[in-house]
Regions:
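Catalytic core of pol beta-like nucleotidyltransferases
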Residues: 1-36, 41-48, 57-112
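Structural signature of the urease/amidohydrolase superfamily beta/alpha-barrel
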Residues: 52-53
Length: 112
């Protein structure tokens, strides 16, 4: 039962967690847009949910998606207060792929 309460408390703070990610993206100097997608954007979170964050980057950012994901999460945790065990999933896409996806999903834009 403790895990359920702990996880729900984390999930209720999803806006702060996403803000930490957006601030990390900004502090890394990335020209990127950040959106919340999935259950949080559609208002259907459950105790087993994670928070899906879409980061739309330029093709010229010069870093692969796995390395970029690592850099963003590390910066968000080390400098912007994202808990290390927060249930967040980063989806890194180039802008042209994002444009197609954004047309079909409910999204919440996030500003740093």
């Amino acid at each position: 039962m403790f895990w359920v309460r702990y996880h729900l408390r984390h999930l209720k703070a999803w806006r702060e967690a996403v803000k930490a990610v957006a601030n990390a993206v900004k502090s890394l100097g990335l020209d990127a847009d950040v959106y919340v997608i999935g259950g949080a954007a559609e208002r259907r979170l459950t105790v087993l949910s994670d928070i899906d964050v879409l980061v739309c980057v330029d093709e010229s950012c010069g870093v692969g998606p796995w390395e970029l994901r690592r850099r963003i999460l590390t910066r968000a945790m080390d400098e912007h207060g994202l808990p290390w065990d927060y249930p967040i999933e980063l989806h890194i896409l180039v802008r042209r792929e994002c444009e197609k996806l954004l047309k079909s999903l409910k999204v919440i834009p996030v500003k740093a």
